[in-house]
Amino acid sequence: MRELLDSEYDVIVIGAGPGGSMASYHSSINGAKTLLIDKSQEIGTPVRCAEAVPYLDEFGINPDPSFIRSKIDGGILVAPNGKKIIVKGGKTQGYVVERKIFDKHLAVRSANVGTKIAIKSRVVGLDYDGEKYTVIVNHLGQIYAIKAKIVIAADGVESSIAEMAGIKCKKKVTEICSCAEYEMTNVKLLDKNMMEFYFGDICPKGYVWIFPKGETANVGLGIIDSKKKAIDYLNEFLEHPLLEGRLDNATPIEFKCGGAPVGGPIEKTVADNFMVVGDAAGQISPISGGGIYLSLSCGSIAGKVAGEAIKSNNCSEDYLVEYENRWKEKYYKLLMDELKYKKVLQKFSEKELNALADAMDERLEEIDVAKIAFRAVKRAPSLLKYFKDII
């Protein structure tokens, strides 16, 4: 480990979540000498999310049985009045995984193409001389100074690394979704391959989820700016009449909590010799709070651009901005549209949520916001005040 931390690297990636591991993987396969640093003593812990991941083929990741717990075909949206909307396409939409194993799988995949990995290593400072960064690392009480031509910050919602580099990424409290979740056994699912989502006063400005996970299920929720704690809402939901007793015999085997930055992406994700990816960059769905897909994709882009920059011997912001251009071209409009839709949905009363559900077909292949908004206003004109900028 000492030799690892005493070396100099082309690229240092900080944070071994999905975004960081994908960035280091693509940096390494593009020829850059890469170090992946994580503060945890075990990659993949603690788990802080509902563990749903997208269809993985586009990332070249084999859906290994070691981490796949359930295949997901779609979702069931449940309105406050109990009406269910089934959203189901024609193929597998993704998976619920064991994140502890999934994250390790991604890190091992990166190591197999040359990435070096340092665990139990906390970054406590950054120094920049105009050409390279010196990353100051505390590993088991020992301080190391490691040089890198490029630093990629993938250190999650609580990111401090980007701030050290002068990039503003601190999130407002009102932009952080507080999440609490039980993994439970003996849950009676509506469908073993469908995710369930519940809306209304049971979870203000958020939603409750039940995700099938093999022999267990993840039951959790995310709330924003609430007077009560997420865990209090979750415990109340476990006895909610909408569940019709489906959790009466369920019991928790694990508790997880965390936060998701749902206020949209940060304004700037690059600087000279520096990039930001994943939750640290706000690359997360403002509506669902899901960020694994975006982290995998944006991490891949960052790693590729880092490798190209090293080959070109140009690590300036003018070169690295290609990362920002590529990810924004793919996702920026989508994220900003979702932010707009989220602000609309958060204003809905339970009565209005029921009216919206009544305006939707009971079976959908996908969510078309404009079409749903048009039908909702047609059936319930009072909703026009919310949807006038959408239809």
From Swiss-Prot:
EC number: 1.3.-.-
Keywords: FAD, Flavoprotein, Lipid biosynthesis, Lipid metabolism, Oxidoreductase, Phospholipid biosynthesis, Phospholipid metabolism
BP term (GO), one: membrane lipid biosynthetic process
GO CC terms: membrane
Chain sites annotated for binding FAD: G19, D38, C49, A50, A52, R99, V123, D279, G291, I292
Binding site for a 2,3-bis-O-(geranylgeranyl)-sn-glycerol 1-phospholipid: V369
HAMAP family: DGGGPL_reductase
Similarity field: Belongs to the geranylgeranyl reductase family. DGGGPL reductase subfamily.
Name of the molecule in the record: Digeranylgeranylglycerophospholipid reductase
